[in-house]
Amino acid sequence: MSEKKRKNYLLAALVFIPIYLFVIILTIHTMHIRMEMPYLDFFSAIREGALDIVRHPLRILPLAPGTGNAVLGVTLVIAASQAVLTIDAKLREHDDPDTVQGDARWLTELDDYNRRFTEPLGEASNDGQGNMIFSQDIYLSMEHPREVRRNLNALVIGGSGAGKSFNYVGPNLMQANCSFVVTDPSGGLLKSYGKFFERRGYKVKCLNLSHMERGNHYNPFRYIHSNKDVVTLVTTLVSNTTPPETKSSEPFWENSEKLLLIAIISYLFNYTEKECQNFSNVMRLLREAKINEFDAEKSTLDYIFEEVKALDPEGFAVKNYEEFKTGAAKTLQSILISVMVRLKAFDLEDVENLTDTDDIDLDMVGNEKTALFVILPTGEGPFNFLASMMYSQLFHRAYDYAENTAEFSQLVMDGGGQLVRCFRAETEEESGERKKEAETFLENARRAVIRHNETTGLYEAVTEDGELVCFRGTKKAARKALGSITDGGYVLANRERSNDGLRLPVHLRLLLDEFANIGKIPEFEKKVATVRKYEISVAIILQSLSQLQNMYEKNWSELAGNCDTTLYLGGGADTVTAKWISELLGKETRIVMNVSYGRGGGSTSLNRQGVELLAPAQLRVLPDDECIVIPKSLYAYKGKKYMTPDHPRWEEVKKSGPYYWSREKARYFDEAAHRGEPAEEEDPVPEEQTPGEEAVRAEQNREMRQKAQEYENNMDAEGNPLIDRPRPLGDAEGAHSGNLSADDHVHGTIREAADTFEKNEILWREMDVVYSSAPAESFSSSA
């Protein structure tokens, strides 16, 4: 029974019971009067009975003859009357006529909303820094998602020029309350807010796909930690390098390309050193996979995988390569050409330089306050698939860290509860060691000094050993930050925080502007549904709903449903989005006057009808400064957009000035992040050589150059083809101990090749070290 019905029944009982008791008492007194004055008629007896109640209220006993039958009869009459009234009420029962056609309305109780959903909770204001901003009046707490019972995902839709960056992304960036990964079309956001973040102690990084030389390096291989990661990487790559118009229901060609790519990437990951793991070497290996349907001779790539199979017959790379080779030669040749065309971007010098090394450090985005800007070319760029690969790996690494090892991390917090440094640990044993390191860091930080760094232009606090503690834009801000660490700093295990430590130390927020240009992220709809518990949130920012429907044709509604807040900034002539928003707003019941005219005159009538709160045509003419916010399980709000200059930190942003990315600054912060880690062994400095030794060295270089040319062209110095197989690298005197016969392996291990190349730096560059036929762990053990 509902609460409303319960209250109605209680009220009816409170009214009915006193009336019933009065009627029974009146009946008893009336029967006494009839016994004393039998000549009175029925109505006169009732009147005298009522007067007798006033004169003798307690004269009930003894009962007059026939009183029992009279009471029973009165009770039956009252019961029958009540039954008739109840049945009639049921027959007349109906819905509220003012809401029967729809009860939608606009959210107006802002004070109540702020108390429930914004920081500080319980107060009628929304001026806390731990809020997300949607409009001038609607905010949402990021610090207490469990209390507000909302996830922090948002779906933002607005046509070109509607203010997606200016009225939504910008104000939320100025909150500076978490780590941000921001899609930045044309780079305007980095220029406007980069220095603001830097002066507040953020690590500012940039993946620039428009001008690649003006950003950090991103090597996808760095974030591969298992063969499963290889499959995910290849799936993302193939999905986002296949033009939509060429996709068909026959997956044979794409699956075959995946087999070859998985085999090569798995080979590099499992059997070569870190320096060799990049897409430049993927392309080099592909060029070694020469296939001729009229010539059954094996290619260099075939020999490489034969060697790998001899060492690791059940290897993942071997299995995929053998499955690829089951096709006919002509088919394999077509597949190889398709793969080369698909990956042609990696032959460009800019892309090669971008992906050969990595300093973007995605693993640290959830460990320290970071602002990563992903700059995309205006419109659809040929390199945007790199962004989808990066986002896919970012999700995977964050999930893996939060689920498996984040609970072991030790955190150094300042007096305000803000994270200063995260010491990551993989196991319980390591957690104890990291705690000691964190305590040592905090102790050293208490003796830190403030200095101005000419490279970065920032004021930084450094320990006596030169370890970076924190940095800010001004000396005053740096002193304040250091003071908060020295006076109130403490060490905290991540597991002592919420969710048993299964969360990132710093909330990670992805503002995916121009979402349609990023490319398709594998299983993105599943990630959006589960990111909340890991301290991750996503804002999907689109120009129209059609973009989401085209990208995720089967799952777009699931994506939209997992965003607890929808923000509509206006869409012009976009009818698809307007109809969808109109349906979300719902209908309200309105009284409509109908007027009709005929020959005999006219008539009017009033009817209640369900009318859209805002029809699609009304949404099309929504004023430029207004927006609509649709929170989960609440009425929608229509009001003013948030104007960026109204933010209390806008003056700070303007004062900070424009940001220009600097290679020197990026290198400094990368070195500072890894300062204190065990250094890799450096190559010994060669002793000074005599002129005779230099001559021998020059001769060895000449011989090595000839051997390399033989290996490349598969022929000897006289131009005669090598019928069996190319001679092994490193056959020159002094390069290896002993001579290798023609029946030996095609080439030596990567360590042998590397040793040779290190001794001949004039001839070989470090990036030329490509091939290997031994597991990577064997190299580290022999080094």
Q: Which residue stretches match the model-derived regions?
A:
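Conserved small-residue-rich
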Residues: Y139, R472-T474
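Conserved ATP-driven motor cores of ASCE-family P-loop NTPases powering translocation/secretion/packaging/pilus
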Residues: Q418, V528-T530, Y534-I628
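Short alpha-helical interface patches
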Residues: A79-S125, N227-L237, N281-N292, L362, ...
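P-loop NTPase motor domains
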Residues: I24, R150-N444, R451-E464, K476, ...
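A short glycine-/small-residue-rich loop at the edge of a beta-strand within enzyme catalytic domains
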Residues: E119-G122, F385, F515, G572
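Short, surface-exposed polybasic-aromatic patches that bind anionic ligands, especially phosphate groups
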Residues: M643
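Basic- and hydrophobic-enriched, low-structure N-terminal and domain-boundary segments
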Residues: M1-A162, F166-P171, E213, E426, ...
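Local beta-strand/beta-hairpin segments that build beta-sheet-rich folds
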Residues: L468-C470
